[in-house]
């Protein structure tokens, strides 16, 4: 398996960054969370003058075999229909990318539809959806590696374009199901506390979803695989788009890019990848606490402090994109505000 070189950002500049922030012409600590963000971004980029050049949004799309079990209110074809919609600029993700100046890369990692005629969709299809993890592993070891490589390739493309920051989103009907299982297994949380409505299930739908996922976990535990192995859990239940997102996160951290994390699905990916490389969390900014059941609890498992709480549950990376102006403000604070000396203001503390 590909190994990534992930370490905490070097701390040698920490005190110099703190001193710069504290000497800006404001009361010490008065810009609160923005000061914390500025420190984090400076450490990621290893500079006292960070930038957010060429922001890039990666959107990975794929289908899930578990959808066949009726765990989602949305039909399977919504995945490919939305992928096409994104090429026409009509999705929520398109609007927020335009608003905040992000370049959008749309990547087919495993959509159950032929999208080859759409040149704005990058074709990295591994298969027409994953296997049904109620009965078998969602993907093989080889497919897992392929998906990681696709994500790393796309993060490399952003880095080579001069990006300092990437956002990652997904499109895949039924992908709250593997996310709920990852939350349960990686967080040691009872499954019933991890299963929510997804795109809009009613109480009976949630009950059915729980029963399917619970049986899938039982089958996994009797499969003969090492059920404590993180990568086994990821590939047995995960989607191609989710593993690609993990690969993108890992390569982005290697490149010292700021990683914007979205909602329930992407936070599940963050938990999964943190079990492989714990230091990666230091490269992540969590955009929001969403409305999908369990998201706030997942954020707590990571010790994350989300920037927004707007009741969002669309996915696609939209919640993270909404938080970008706050991140931008943090960078502008440390790069554009004057300090006490240059402003001829008495430093009174």
Positions of PLM-derived features:
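N-terminal loops that bind phosphate or other acidic moieties
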Residues: 1-349
């Amino acid at each position: 398996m590909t190994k990534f070189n992930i370490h905490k950002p070097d701390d040698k500049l920490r005190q110099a960054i703190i001193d710069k922030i504290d000497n800006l012409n404001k009361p010490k600590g008065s810009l609160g969370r923005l000061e914390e963000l500025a420190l984090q971004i400076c450490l990621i980029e290893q500079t006292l003058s960070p930038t957010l050049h060429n922001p890039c949004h990666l959107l990975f799309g794929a289908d899930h075999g578990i959808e066949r079990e009726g765990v989602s209110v949305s039909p399977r074809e919504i995945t490919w229909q939305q992928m096409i919609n994104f090429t026409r600029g009509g999705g929520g993700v398109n609007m927020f990318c335009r608003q905040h100046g992000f370049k959008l890369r749309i990547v087919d990692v495993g959509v159950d539809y032929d999208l080859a005629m759409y040149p704005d969709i990058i074709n990295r299809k591994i298969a027409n959806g994953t296997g049904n993890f109620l009965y078998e592993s969602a993907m093989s070891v080889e497919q897992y590696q392929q998906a990681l490589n696709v994500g790393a390739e796309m993060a490399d493309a952003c880095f080579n374009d001069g990006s300092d920051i990437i956002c990652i989103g997904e499109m895949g009907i039924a992908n709250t199901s593997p996310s709920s299982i990852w939350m349960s297994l990686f967080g040691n949380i009872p499954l019933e506390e991890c299963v929510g409505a997804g795109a809009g299930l009613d109480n009976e739908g949630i009950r059915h979803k729980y029963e399917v996922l619970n049986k899938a976990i039982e089958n996994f535990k009797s499969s003969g695989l090492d059920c404590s192995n993180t990568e086994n859990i990821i590939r047995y239940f995960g989607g191609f788009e989710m593993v690609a997102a993990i690969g993108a996160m890992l390569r982005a951290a290697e490149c010292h890019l700021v990683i914007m994390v979205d909602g329930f699905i992407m936070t599940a990916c963050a938990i999964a990848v943190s079990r492989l490389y714990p230091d990666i969390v230091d490269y992540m900014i969590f955009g929001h606490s969403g409305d999908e059941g369990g998201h706030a609890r997942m954020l707590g498992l990571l010790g994350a402090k989300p920037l927004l709480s707007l009741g969002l549950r669309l996915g696609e990376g939209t919640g993270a994109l909404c938080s970008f102006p706050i991140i931008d403000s943090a960078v502008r604070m440390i790069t554009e505000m004057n300090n006490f000396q240059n402003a001829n203001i008495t430093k009174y503390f």
